[in-house]
Amino acid sequence: MKILWISPWFGNYRIPVYENLNKLSGGNFYIICSQENTSDLVREKLKATLGDHAVIMSGEKRTTMGSEESDFANSALVIKRQPGLYKAVKDIKPDIVITEGFGGWAPVGIRYAVLHRKKLCIFYERTAYVERNSPKWRSWYRRIVGTPVDHFLINGTLTEEYLNEGLHFRKTPKVKGCMCADSFGLSQAVAKVTVEDKQALRDELGLKDGLTYLFVGQMVERKGIKELLHVWSKHIETYPNDNLVVIGKGILLDTMKELYDRLPSVHILGAINYDLLYRYYALCDVFIMPTLEDNWCLVIPEAMACGKPVASSIYNGGHYELVKDGVNGYNFDPLKESSILETLEKFHHADLEAMGKKSVEIESDFTPDKAANRIFEACKKVFGKC
């Protein structure tokens, strides 16, 4: 059973999943990706993991309609074409083709599976909320090209609901839990941080002795950082010793620093090398993600693996599976000022240590090996129907 995954873009978190799939398939796992859309580090790790089974293509052609200035979903239509992609797929001769969604490079994989009567799986992450502004023609397109799909590989319940109710794929099999974060190395590094190490970093940043909340993400509109910073000054009226550490880069970075650096409790650090991020995860009491739109926010399970209570936006598609109110954190609406303030306050009355332990327990079901196992079992099921 030869499996091919066509994925133009992915981050480091996917490498362990691919590695496990290759082991499970007995070395019969292949991937085709884009040179332009992946980082040097990702490609280096991919080649070290899969060798010649990783096909890296270049020269992608893009046609854009609409504005790409916004990073919200459906703000623009981008049509992608990769010269030589169909031939590359044909040369591998896969028994099962996995595509990323319905667009991008997916039509080539779908075409191959249909013409050669091979099995087709689609890895899908979108939710009804993320697709709230999707035009009707796009939904019709997805319904049509998704007709031959044998199995959907999805992240969670909200994606399942969208596929069933929004796109009417109720009868097509689906397996949840196919998304994960590569959090093992991060959690191991956090576990080694000493009390003295934490205090040294606290002194370096000039933190007060209240709770420390951590945000890690892009400094863009979609991540809700503006909404969080806007209400912070009201939060510290009640809890003046609390701290907010903000890590990330993006178009809002300079503006946010200009507006909020005057607050002694706000520490906007900009980009931090990934190899040093563990220090800040170890330092914080609570991790917070106020995103206004996300399929499955990876930093939430990363923080959970590090034993942290989490505050998640209800617009994060992963909140349904990952964040249990009052158990390992709280969900909130970042578009409502009162919701943010109430959530920040709740952690002052919670057992943070117990919440952190629950975070680890919940996240343990969303590891790369478990995601790979679910995907491989789905592949075996559809292949068995040949």
Task: Describe every region a protein language model picked out.
Residues 292:
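Aromatic "clamp/platform" in nucleotide-sugar-dependent glycosyltransferases that forms part
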Residues 271-272, 279-284:
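Short alpha-helical donor nucleotide-sugar binding micro-motif in glycosyltransferases
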Residues 254-272:
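Nucleotide-activated donor-binding/catalytic signature segment of Leloir-type glycosyltransferases, i.e.
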Residues 118-136, 148-151:
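A short, histidine- and acid-enriched strand-loop-helix "catalytic/donor-clamping" loop
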Residues 4, 207-223, 229-232:
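Conserved donor-binding/catalytic core segment of Leloir-type glycosyltransferases
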Residues 309-313:
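Short hydrophobic beta-strand element within catalytic cores of glycosyltransferases
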Residues 147-198, 208:
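Donor nucleotide-sugar binding/catalytic pocket of nucleotide-sugar-dependent glycosyltransferases
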